[in-house]
Amino acid sequence: MAGIGRVALMQEPVAAVMSVMKAHQIDGTFLIYDLGGGTLDIAIAQSTAGRVSLLSHGGIALCGGRDFDRRVRESIVKPWLTANFDLPEDFSIHPKYRRLMRMAALAVERAKIELSAKDSATISLSEAETQCADECGSEIYIDCDLTRDDFNQLIADCVDKSITAAREAIQKAGLSPFDIERIVFI
């Protein structure tokens, strides 16, 4: 058509890992596990003498960091707010509380990152950060705890689905888990 040979389309994380494997002459069969903000991408690639082949790929939409954050907001932050402030039932979608929910999303993400090094974290926002009052005029703040165990429990089904997706990608490549020599987490 435009003088371009056959082109293979692939997901960006898969292309990046394949480029690194080729540049560094790393041989083996790899499972690439890319848990992004909104999706999980899984690929099985094989590298031999600088030649990289994509054997299979798969993944899960709506299984990423933002989904984990949403679960924490829905299960921990929203109940804490309704227990401590006079808020309408639909406050999380109410325009008056839009800033509060955006700020809460950032606080949840900070706490989630903190959990990578600690067993618990505090999801906190001061009154000055939220710049929001409840229906009675009380200034709203957030100060609730998130433990690693609570977080793991909230995302357990997504983790289980990701393991299933990895097994399916391995099977689709015609391999067994014992054939995977390296796992690359992105």
Question: At which residue positions do the language-model features occur?
Answer:
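Oxyanion-binding/catalytic loops of NTP- or PPi-dependent enzymes
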Residues: M1-I186
